[in-house]
Amino acid sequence: MCFILPRMGAGVFVSDNRLQFSRSLAEVLRNQGCRVCLSAHEAARGDVPVRDGLVYWNRASPFSLRGILLQIENLGIVLETAVFVFDAQSYVDLYPGDDFSSIDRISVDLIVANMALVHMLTAHFVSQARGKLLFVHRETSAHCASAMVSVASAAFVRMAEECVLGLARKDAPRMQTLLIRLDGVDDDSYTQWIATQLASPVLSRGPGRWVRAGQRSFFGK
């Protein structure tokens, strides 16, 4: 069962529709009755209809970033949960280059843009005095073919931890966070597990601690 939506149109933002994990998670949540929107790169927009629940974003443009919340509002979604996904294994395939231009692109797309996105949505939830933030991370293999993706992966982990700790210092009792580690490739089980966590009254009793997807929760789910 999906978490009970407190009012009509309440929903979930999931980052990066280029990732199979993000698409699979979005599908699971939709099948359980959640309103889900996925971020997509602006260049891929074309004639994709709004009903697909995609919000478009040029990662190199701060102006484009500011349009995300407006797009979500136009979809009729009341945002209450954001899931930020970093699948380093998939990003190695998406960013195969190792020249200077590739380094610059990875830095912008996977470090700067992600930090800006997290900052904006966190600020939005803080202003609403409620919200759930989930960070989902899958590490690269031991012999990663991309040093820059490895750097971006480490940056995501640190950013997630700093975000959670920063929120813990704020007087925002209705803000909840969860750090999730994907330790394998059983994505069907992982997506179902994440959906179950969203149904829990409390995401985590240990903010700032990474939990393994599939790990038994505090409430026996």
Curated annotation (Swiss-Prot):
Protein name per its UniProtKB record: Uncharacterized protein TP_0816
